[in-house]
Protein backbone atom coordinates (compact mmCIF):
# COMPACT_ATOMS: atom_id res chain seq x y z
CA UNK A 1 0.00 0.00 0.00
CA UNK A 2 1.33 3.46 -0.91
CA UNK A 3 2.05 5.80 1.97
CA UNK A 4 -0.86 8.24 2.55
CA UNK A 5 1.77 10.94 2.99
CA UNK A 6 2.59 10.66 -0.71
CA UNK A 7 -0.94 10.24 -2.12
CA UNK A 8 -3.34 12.40 -0.09
CA UNK A 9 -3.84 15.73 -1.97
CA UNK A 10 -3.07 17.90 1.09
CA UNK A 11 -0.47 15.67 2.74
CA UNK A 12 1.35 15.41 -0.60
CA UNK A 13 1.94 19.19 -0.66
CA UNK A 14 3.27 19.16 2.92
CA UNK A 15 5.40 16.10 2.15
CA UNK A 16 6.99 17.67 -0.92
CA UNK A 17 7.70 20.92 0.93
CA UNK A 18 8.87 19.75 4.37
CA UNK A 19 9.55 16.00 4.44
CA UNK A 20 10.82 14.46 1.19
CA UNK A 21 12.15 17.75 -0.20
CA UNK A 22 15.68 17.18 -1.59
CA UNK A 23 17.93 19.76 0.11
CA UNK A 24 21.65 20.54 -0.35
CA UNK A 25 23.78 18.72 2.22
CA UNK A 26 25.97 21.73 3.02
CA UNK A 27 23.54 24.58 3.83
CA UNK A 28 24.64 26.39 6.99
CA UNK A 29 22.68 28.01 9.82
CA UNK A 30 22.16 31.06 7.58
CA UNK A 31 19.49 28.94 5.85
CA UNK A 32 17.56 28.61 9.15
CA UNK A 33 16.28 32.18 8.90
CA UNK A 34 13.43 31.36 6.50
CA UNK A 35 11.84 28.94 8.96
CA UNK A 36 12.51 31.38 11.84
CA UNK A 37 10.59 34.05 9.91
CA UNK A 38 7.73 31.56 9.62
CA UNK A 39 7.86 30.99 13.40
CA UNK A 40 7.89 34.78 13.97
CA UNK A 41 4.88 35.26 11.69
CA UNK A 42 2.84 32.55 13.44
CA UNK A 43 3.80 33.96 16.85
CA UNK A 44 2.82 37.51 15.78
CA UNK A 45 -0.53 36.36 14.36
CA UNK A 46 -1.37 34.41 17.54
CA UNK A 47 -0.31 37.09 20.04
CA UNK A 48 -1.93 39.74 17.82
CA UNK A 49 -5.21 37.81 17.78
CA UNK A 50 -5.34 37.73 21.59
CA UNK A 51 -4.44 41.42 21.79
CA UNK A 52 -7.19 42.28 19.27
CA UNK A 53 -9.74 40.60 21.58
CA UNK A 54 -9.14 43.34 24.17
CA UNK A 55 -7.99 46.32 22.10
CA UNK A 56 -10.32 49.13 21.00
CA UNK A 57 -9.40 51.19 17.93
CA UNK A 58 -10.85 54.47 19.13
CA UNK A 59 -8.77 57.58 19.93
CA UNK A 60 -10.52 58.00 23.29
CA UNK A 61 -9.94 54.43 24.52
CA UNK A 62 -6.98 52.95 22.53
CA UNK A 63 -4.29 53.96 25.05
CA UNK A 64 -6.47 52.87 28.00
CA UNK A 65 -7.24 49.52 26.35
CA UNK A 66 -3.51 48.76 26.00
CA UNK A 67 -3.03 49.69 29.69
CA UNK A 68 -6.00 47.45 30.54
CA UNK A 69 -4.39 44.55 28.61
CA UNK A 70 -1.17 44.96 30.61
CA UNK A 71 -2.81 45.38 34.04
CA UNK A 72 -6.10 43.46 34.07
CA UNK A 73 -6.05 40.75 31.38
CA UNK A 74 -4.65 37.37 32.45
CA UNK A 75 -1.03 37.32 31.24
CA UNK A 76 -1.90 40.31 29.03
CA UNK A 77 1.45 41.95 29.79
CA UNK A 78 3.40 38.96 28.44
CA UNK A 79 1.23 38.76 25.30
CA UNK A 80 1.71 42.49 24.67
CA UNK A 81 5.48 42.39 25.17
CA UNK A 82 5.87 39.18 23.13
CA UNK A 83 4.05 40.94 20.29
CA UNK A 84 6.11 44.14 20.53
CA UNK A 85 9.47 42.39 20.89
CA UNK A 86 8.41 39.67 18.46
CA UNK A 87 8.35 42.41 15.80
CA UNK A 88 11.98 43.22 16.65
CA UNK A 89 12.98 39.54 16.37
CA UNK A 90 11.06 39.40 13.06
CA UNK A 91 13.12 42.28 11.64
CA UNK A 92 16.43 40.89 12.98
CA UNK A 93 15.68 37.61 11.15
CA UNK A 94 14.47 39.52 8.08
CA UNK A 95 17.63 41.65 7.78
CA UNK A 96 19.86 38.59 8.30
CA UNK A 97 17.81 36.64 5.72
CA UNK A 98 18.24 39.43 3.13
CA UNK A 99 21.94 39.71 4.04
CA UNK A 100 22.35 35.97 3.49
CA UNK A 101 20.69 36.33 0.07
CA UNK A 102 23.09 39.13 -0.88
CA UNK A 103 26.20 37.33 0.38
CA UNK A 104 25.53 33.97 -1.25
CA UNK A 105 23.96 35.32 -4.48
CA UNK A 106 20.49 33.89 -3.82
CA UNK A 107 19.03 36.83 -5.76
CA UNK A 108 19.69 34.93 -9.00
CA UNK A 109 16.41 33.11 -8.25
CA UNK A 110 14.51 36.06 -9.73
CA UNK A 111 10.90 35.21 -8.79
CA UNK A 112 11.80 34.14 -5.26
CA UNK A 113 13.91 37.28 -4.74
CA UNK A 114 11.31 39.71 -6.13
CA UNK A 115 8.52 38.24 -4.01
CA UNK A 116 10.93 38.47 -1.06
CA UNK A 117 11.35 42.22 -1.69
CA UNK A 118 7.55 42.62 -1.86
CA UNK A 119 7.35 40.69 1.43
CA UNK A 120 9.90 43.06 2.99
CA UNK A 121 7.79 46.07 1.99
CA UNK A 122 4.61 44.41 3.30
CA UNK A 123 6.20 43.55 6.67
CA UNK A 124 7.49 47.13 6.99
CA UNK A 125 4.00 48.48 6.24
CA UNK A 126 2.48 46.13 8.83
CA UNK A 127 4.99 47.17 11.49
CA UNK A 128 4.39 50.86 10.75
CA UNK A 129 0.59 50.71 11.09
CA UNK A 130 0.99 48.49 14.17
CA UNK A 131 3.20 51.06 15.90
CA UNK A 132 0.37 53.62 15.62
CA UNK A 133 -2.17 51.46 17.50
CA UNK A 134 -1.15 52.03 21.17
CA UNK A 135 -1.88 55.76 20.51
CA UNK A 136 1.05 57.05 22.54
CA UNK A 137 2.97 60.22 21.67
CA UNK A 138 5.43 58.49 19.33
CA UNK A 139 2.57 56.50 17.72
CA UNK A 140 0.68 59.69 16.89
CA UNK A 141 3.63 61.80 15.77
CA UNK A 142 5.27 58.92 13.89
CA UNK A 143 2.02 58.41 11.96
CA UNK A 144 1.75 62.16 11.27
CA UNK A 145 5.34 62.57 10.05
CA UNK A 146 5.60 59.40 7.94
CA UNK A 147 2.18 59.70 6.24
CA UNK A 148 2.94 63.39 5.60
CA UNK A 149 5.89 62.32 3.41
CA UNK A 150 3.36 61.33 0.74
CA UNK A 151 2.48 65.02 0.35
CA UNK A 152 5.85 65.33 -1.45
CA UNK A 153 4.31 63.51 -4.44
CA UNK A 154 3.67 66.22 -7.06
CA UNK A 155 0.09 67.30 -7.81
CA UNK A 156 -1.80 64.52 -5.93
CA UNK A 157 0.30 64.51 -2.72
CA UNK A 158 -1.94 66.58 -0.41
CA UNK A 159 -5.16 64.85 -1.53
CA UNK A 160 -3.49 61.46 -1.07
CA UNK A 161 -2.42 62.24 2.52
CA UNK A 162 -5.91 63.48 3.48
CA UNK A 163 -7.43 60.39 1.84
CA UNK A 164 -5.16 58.12 3.93
CA UNK A 165 -5.90 60.11 7.11
CA UNK A 166 -9.65 60.11 6.46
CA UNK A 167 -9.72 63.80 7.41
CA UNK A 168 -7.48 66.82 7.80
CA UNK A 169 -5.27 65.28 10.50
CA UNK A 170 -4.37 61.93 12.07
CA UNK A 171 -7.52 61.14 14.06
CA UNK A 172 -10.15 58.49 14.85
CA UNK A 173 -10.63 57.51 11.17
CA UNK A 174 -6.86 57.02 10.77
CA UNK A 175 -6.56 54.82 13.86
CA UNK A 176 -9.54 52.65 12.87
CA UNK A 177 -8.27 52.03 9.32
CA UNK A 178 -4.71 51.39 10.56
CA UNK A 179 -6.09 48.71 12.89
CA UNK A 180 -7.95 47.16 9.94
CA UNK A 181 -4.75 47.18 7.85
CA UNK A 182 -2.71 45.77 10.74
CA UNK A 183 -5.16 42.89 11.07
CA UNK A 184 -5.35 41.97 7.36
CA UNK A 185 -1.70 42.45 6.28
CA UNK A 186 -0.19 39.48 8.22
CA UNK A 187 -2.52 37.12 6.33
CA UNK A 188 -1.40 38.68 3.04
CA UNK A 189 2.20 38.15 4.25
CA UNK A 190 1.39 34.47 4.96
CA UNK A 191 -0.04 34.05 1.44
CA UNK A 192 2.99 35.77 -0.14
CA UNK A 193 5.32 33.57 1.96
CA UNK A 194 3.65 30.49 0.45
CA UNK A 195 4.23 31.87 -3.07
CA UNK A 196 7.83 32.66 -2.02
CA UNK A 197 8.26 28.98 -1.01
CA UNK A 198 6.51 27.77 -4.16
CA UNK A 199 9.03 29.59 -6.37
CA UNK A 200 11.95 28.48 -4.18
CA UNK A 201 10.91 24.82 -4.54
CA UNK A 202 10.83 25.21 -8.33
CA UNK A 203 14.62 25.68 -8.31
CA UNK A 204 15.69 24.18 -4.98
CA UNK A 205 17.81 25.96 -2.38
CA UNK A 206 21.07 27.72 -3.08
CA UNK A 207 24.06 26.71 -0.91
CA UNK A 208 27.15 28.48 0.51
CA UNK A 209 29.37 27.59 -2.46
CA UNK A 210 26.88 28.87 -5.05
CA UNK A 211 27.52 25.69 -7.08
CA UNK A 212 24.56 23.47 -8.17
CA UNK A 213 24.08 20.74 -5.56
CA UNK A 214 22.00 18.28 -7.60
CA UNK A 215 24.65 15.58 -7.19
CA UNK A 216 24.51 15.72 -3.39
CA UNK A 217 21.01 16.07 -1.92
CA UNK A 218 19.62 14.86 1.41
CA UNK A 219 15.96 14.67 2.55
CA UNK A 220 14.69 17.72 4.46
CA UNK A 221 13.33 15.49 7.25
CA UNK A 222 14.91 14.59 9.68
CA UNK A 223 18.10 16.60 9.03
CA UNK A 224 16.75 20.10 8.53
CA UNK A 225 13.57 19.68 10.58
CA UNK A 226 15.75 19.05 13.65
CA UNK A 227 18.00 21.95 12.68
CA UNK A 228 15.00 24.27 12.26
CA UNK A 229 13.54 23.21 15.64
CA UNK A 230 16.87 24.04 17.31
CA UNK A 231 16.83 27.46 15.59
CA UNK A 232 13.23 28.07 16.72
CA UNK A 233 14.15 27.16 20.32
CA UNK A 234 17.09 29.59 20.29
CA UNK A 235 14.86 32.31 18.80
CA UNK A 236 12.26 31.70 21.53
CA UNK A 237 15.03 31.83 24.17
CA UNK A 238 16.28 35.24 22.94
CA UNK A 239 12.72 36.56 22.63
CA UNK A 240 11.75 35.47 26.14
CA UNK A 241 14.99 36.87 27.61
CA UNK A 242 14.04 40.20 26.05
CA UNK A 243 10.38 40.00 27.12
CA UNK A 244 11.02 38.91 30.71
CA UNK A 245 14.14 40.93 31.56
CA UNK A 246 13.97 44.17 29.56
CA UNK A 247 10.70 44.40 27.62
CA UNK A 248 11.07 48.15 26.99
CA UNK A 249 14.71 48.03 25.85
CA UNK A 250 13.84 48.58 22.18
CA UNK A 251 10.76 50.77 22.71
CA UNK A 252 10.44 54.53 23.10
CA UNK A 253 9.60 56.00 26.55
CA UNK A 254 7.50 58.69 24.80
CA UNK A 255 4.97 56.02 23.87
CA UNK A 256 3.98 55.71 27.55
CA UNK A 257 2.51 59.23 27.26
CA UNK A 258 -0.97 59.35 25.67
CA UNK A 259 -1.10 60.98 22.21
CA UNK A 260 -1.40 64.76 22.37
CA UNK A 261 -1.71 66.69 19.07
CA UNK A 262 -0.81 69.94 20.91
CA UNK A 263 2.54 68.73 22.21
CA UNK A 264 5.29 67.62 19.79
CA UNK A 265 8.01 65.33 21.25
CA UNK A 266 11.56 66.79 20.99
CA UNK A 267 12.82 63.90 18.81
CA UNK A 268 10.36 62.10 16.56
CA UNK A 269 11.81 58.76 15.47
CA UNK A 270 10.42 55.40 14.33
CA UNK A 271 11.18 51.98 15.84
CA UNK A 272 14.85 50.89 15.65
CA UNK A 273 14.33 48.69 12.57
CA UNK A 274 13.34 51.71 10.44
CA UNK A 275 16.13 54.01 11.65
CA UNK A 276 18.53 53.23 8.76
CA UNK A 277 15.90 54.27 6.19
CA UNK A 278 14.91 57.27 8.35
CA UNK A 279 18.56 58.40 8.42
CA UNK A 280 18.72 58.21 4.60
CA UNK A 281 15.46 60.20 4.40
CA UNK A 282 16.82 62.93 6.71
CA UNK A 283 20.19 63.16 4.97
CA UNK A 284 18.64 64.90 1.94
CA UNK A 285 17.52 68.50 2.65
CA UNK A 286 14.57 68.23 0.24
CA UNK A 287 11.22 66.56 0.91
CA UNK A 288 10.70 64.81 -2.43
CA UNK A 289 14.40 63.90 -2.71
CA UNK A 290 14.33 62.41 0.79
CA UNK A 291 11.23 60.33 0.03
CA UNK A 292 12.77 59.04 -3.22
CA UNK A 293 15.99 58.11 -1.37
CA UNK A 294 13.95 56.38 1.34
CA UNK A 295 12.04 54.23 -1.17
CA UNK A 296 15.20 53.61 -3.25
CA UNK A 297 17.11 52.34 -0.20
CA UNK A 298 14.82 49.27 -0.13
CA UNK A 299 13.78 49.13 -3.80
CA UNK A 300 17.48 48.93 -4.78
CA UNK A 301 17.31 45.24 -3.78
CA UNK A 302 15.25 44.60 -6.96
CA UNK A 303 18.33 45.67 -8.98
CA UNK A 304 20.71 43.17 -7.33
CA UNK A 305 20.41 40.52 -10.10
CA UNK A 306 21.21 43.21 -12.72
CA UNK A 307 24.21 44.48 -10.74
CA UNK A 308 25.74 41.00 -10.43
CA UNK A 309 28.83 41.08 -12.68
CA UNK A 310 30.82 38.26 -11.06
CA UNK A 311 31.20 34.89 -12.78
CA UNK A 312 30.80 33.23 -9.40
CA UNK A 313 27.44 33.25 -7.69
CA UNK A 314 28.46 33.28 -4.02
CA UNK A 315 30.89 35.59 -2.22
CA UNK A 316 32.42 32.57 -0.48
CA UNK A 317 35.54 32.62 -2.69
CA UNK A 318 35.64 36.39 -3.33
CA UNK A 319 37.57 38.15 -0.51
CA UNK A 320 37.30 41.69 -1.97
CA UNK A 321 33.52 41.42 -2.33
CA UNK A 322 33.33 39.98 1.19
CA UNK A 323 35.20 43.02 2.48
CA UNK A 324 32.74 45.35 0.72
CA UNK A 325 29.77 43.39 2.05
CA UNK A 326 30.89 43.80 5.67
CA UNK A 327 31.60 47.51 5.07
CA UNK A 328 27.98 47.73 3.85
CA UNK A 329 26.78 46.02 7.06
CA UNK A 330 28.85 48.47 9.17
CA UNK A 331 27.41 51.34 7.11
CA UNK A 332 23.84 50.18 7.80
CA UNK A 333 24.62 49.96 11.54
CA UNK A 334 26.01 53.51 11.36
CA UNK A 335 22.83 54.69 9.61
CA UNK A 336 20.72 52.97 12.30
CA UNK A 337 22.66 54.84 15.01
CA UNK A 338 22.37 58.18 13.15
CA UNK A 339 18.61 57.73 12.66
CA UNK A 340 18.16 57.80 16.43
CA UNK A 341 20.27 60.96 16.94
CA UNK A 342 19.03 64.59 16.88
CA UNK A 343 19.38 66.58 13.63
CA UNK A 344 22.53 68.55 14.49
CA UNK A 345 26.27 68.62 13.77
CA UNK A 346 28.12 66.17 13.49
CA UNK A 347 25.24 63.71 13.02
CA UNK A 348 23.92 65.39 9.85
CA UNK A 349 27.31 65.06 8.09
CA UNK A 350 27.86 61.47 9.26
CA UNK A 351 24.35 60.56 8.02
CA UNK A 352 24.96 62.14 4.62
CA UNK A 353 28.31 60.36 4.19
CA UNK A 354 26.84 57.02 5.31
CA UNK A 355 23.90 57.45 2.88
CA UNK A 356 26.23 58.22 -0.05
CA UNK A 357 28.41 55.22 0.88
CA UNK A 358 25.34 52.93 1.02
CA UNK A 359 24.30 53.68 -2.57
CA UNK A 360 27.92 53.86 -3.76
CA UNK A 361 28.75 50.35 -2.47
CA UNK A 362 25.65 48.73 -4.00
CA UNK A 363 25.51 50.57 -7.33
CA UNK A 364 29.20 51.12 -8.13
CA UNK A 365 31.76 49.42 -5.88
CA UNK A 366 30.25 45.91 -5.80
CA UNK A 367 29.86 45.50 -9.62
CA UNK A 368 33.35 47.02 -10.22
CA UNK A 369 34.96 44.79 -7.55
CA UNK A 370 33.29 41.70 -9.07
CA UNK A 371 34.70 42.60 -12.50
CA UNK A 372 38.19 43.08 -11.01
CA UNK A 373 37.92 39.67 -9.30
CA UNK A 374 36.94 38.10 -12.64
CA UNK A 375 40.05 39.59 -14.26
CA UNK A 376 42.30 38.48 -11.39
CA UNK A 377 41.08 34.93 -12.01
CA UNK A 378 41.70 35.47 -15.76
CA UNK A 379 38.01 34.88 -16.53
Curated annotation (Swiss-Prot):
Q: Where does heme b b562 bind?
A: 83, 182
User: What more does the record tell us?
Assistant: Heme 1 (or BL or b562) is low-potential and absorbs at about 562 nm, and heme 2 (or BH or b566) is high-potential and absorbs at about 566 nm.
Query: Mind telling me what this protein is named?
Result: Cytochrome b
The entry's localization annotation reads: Mitochondrion inner membrane
Taxonomic lineage of this organism? Eukaryota, Metazoa, Chordata, Craniata, Vertebrata
Q: Which family does it belong to?
A: Belongs to the cytochrome b family.
User: Which species expresses this protein natively?
Assistant: Alces alces alces (European moose)
Which gene is annotated as encoding this protein in its UniProt record?
MT-CYB
Q: Which residues bind heme b b566?
A: 97, 196
Does the keyword field hold Mitochondrion?
A: yes
Q: What is its main location?
A: mitochondrion
Quote the record's binding site residues for a ubiquinone.
201
